[in-house]
């Protein structure tokens, strides 16, 4: 196995654990809501607060990662994530749940700016769409197994058992990833930046502004794709639990279909974008996502729900590698982490606001409201991309 494949496998496994362990939390909200008497607004505070912590942390982590050892930073994040999962076994109510999730979200902030940046550096000159597609697919695969098994295990073993199980998996992933990349070329682990001048705050802000100007058309897409993940994982189990007679295990299977389809789509992404092109892939993704968002707010029949989740899985997950590949092509390797840190911060900032509003509006009008929000905003992004069809995306 060559160095590039070792890096891709290691980063992919870290992504699988990172996204899988984080996906466990919202699936347990129906249990926590009853156990700790939580309101939808409190759930919105928990999810939005967690994203806010990630937003702040990713700016800092992204900025420092470009001159540091990527493998060490990623391993540190996974170990901290494992520790935070153990802390979650000690939940006593809303405040402790909020505190421990904030710690977990800080720990999960390491992967995306560093891991995606590492893949971007490694594959920038050779099949970047393939690299982004595979790392996205492995992250989705981790979340798929989490969604598929979480509610079932929680019913037979208890929710605390889940956190211990994922913590053990995380420690194992770190040991395996460190072993796998132990002998790879140092140049693939650390990118030296010959510019040793320390930036002033004004220079840092100017640099960030210039980076974001180059991808301004993609920014709404990043926000909606991130918000779609949060809304579906956080509020779909609550919607189905309230509006249907389905058991928690069946609800978990329905949600897992969504992400399982996403795994397949990401693996096929390179071929799809060759046929459609990245821009058309994004237009298709956001238009379909919008239609399915409206559909989720209306239909509760199990057959229709399954069809919706398949189409929503295709449309949601195909947008991530397309967006990241666009950004990778215009980003210099010495500022990969910094660039993805800025982008993911904006993505999570928008997602934080939308998740909080979703919780607040759900208390007022009903838990179907988040999917109306998703439908409207996804349609807006699709129309925006169509309107700019004759211009460069970046």
For the regions a language model picked out, list residue spans one by one:
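Helix-loop-helix hairpin linking two adjacent transmembrane segments in secondary transporters
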Residues: 135-182
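Extracytoplasmic gate region of multi-pass secondary transporters
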Residues: 25-26, 214-256
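Helix-to-loop junctions at the C-terminal end of transmembrane segments
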Residues: 57-69, 265-277, 362-363
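A late C-terminal transmembrane helix in Major Facilitator Superfamily
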Residues: 333-364
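Conserved MFS/SLC helix-loop-helix module at the cytosolic interface between two early adjacent transmembrane helices
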Residues: 56-92
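Residue-level signature of mid-helix packing/kink "hotspots" within the transmembrane helices
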Residues: 23, 51-59, 143-144, 259-267, ...
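Cytoplasmic helix-loop-helix junction between adjacent transmembrane helices
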Residues: 101-139
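Juxtamembrane intracellular "pre-TM" segments in multi-pass secondary transporters
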Residues: 1-2, 185-218
């Amino acid at each position: 196995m060559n160095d590039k494949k070792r890096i891709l496998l290691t980063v992919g496994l870290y992504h699988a654990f990172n996204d899988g362990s984080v996906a466990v939390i919202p699936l347990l909200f129906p249990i926590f809501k009853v156990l700790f008497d939580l309101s939808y607004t409190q759930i919105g505070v928990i999810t939005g607060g967690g994203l806010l912590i990630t937003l702040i942390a990713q700016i800092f982590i992204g900025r420092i990662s470009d001159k540091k050892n990527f493998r060490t930073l990623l391993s540190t994040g996974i170990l901290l994530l494992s520790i935070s999962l153990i802390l979650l076994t000690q939940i006593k109510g809303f405040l402790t749940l909020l505190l421990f999730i904030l710690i977990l979200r800080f720990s999960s902030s390491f992967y995306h700016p560093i891991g995606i940046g590492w893949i971007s550096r490694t594959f920038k000159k050779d099949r970047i769409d393939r690299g982004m597609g595979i790392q996205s697919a492995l992250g989705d695969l981790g979340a798929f197994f989490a969604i598929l098994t979480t509610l079932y295990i929680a019913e037979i073993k208890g929710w605390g058992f889940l956190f211990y199980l994922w913590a053990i998996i995380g420690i194992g992933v770190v040991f395996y990833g460190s072993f796998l990349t132990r002998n790879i070329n140092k140049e693939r682990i650390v990118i030296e930046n010959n510019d040793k001048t320390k930036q002033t705050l004004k220079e840092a802000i100017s640099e960030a502004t210039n980076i974001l100007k180059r991808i301004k058309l993609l920014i709404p897409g990043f926000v909606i794709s991130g918000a779609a993940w949060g809304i579906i994982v956080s509020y779909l189990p609550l919607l189905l639990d309230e509006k249907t007679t389905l058991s928690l295990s069946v609800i978990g299977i329905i949600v897992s279909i969504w992400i399982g389809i996403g795994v397949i789509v990401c693996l096929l992404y390179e071929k799809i974008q060759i046929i459609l092109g990245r821009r058309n892939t994004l237009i298709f993704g956001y238009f379909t996502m919008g239609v399915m968002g409206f559909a989720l707010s209306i239909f509760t029949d199990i057959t229709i729900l399954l069809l919706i989740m398949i189409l929503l899985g295709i449309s949601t997950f195909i947008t991530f590698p397309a967006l990241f590949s666009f950004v990778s092509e215009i980003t210099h390797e010495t500022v990969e982490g910094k660039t993805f840190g800025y982008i993911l911060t904006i993505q999570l900032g928008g997602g934080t606001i939308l998740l909080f509003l979703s919780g607040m509006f759900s208390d007022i009008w009903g838990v179907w409201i988040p999917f109306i929000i998703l439908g409207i905003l996804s349609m807006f992004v699709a129309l925006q991309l169509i309107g700019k069809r004759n211009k460069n995306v970046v």
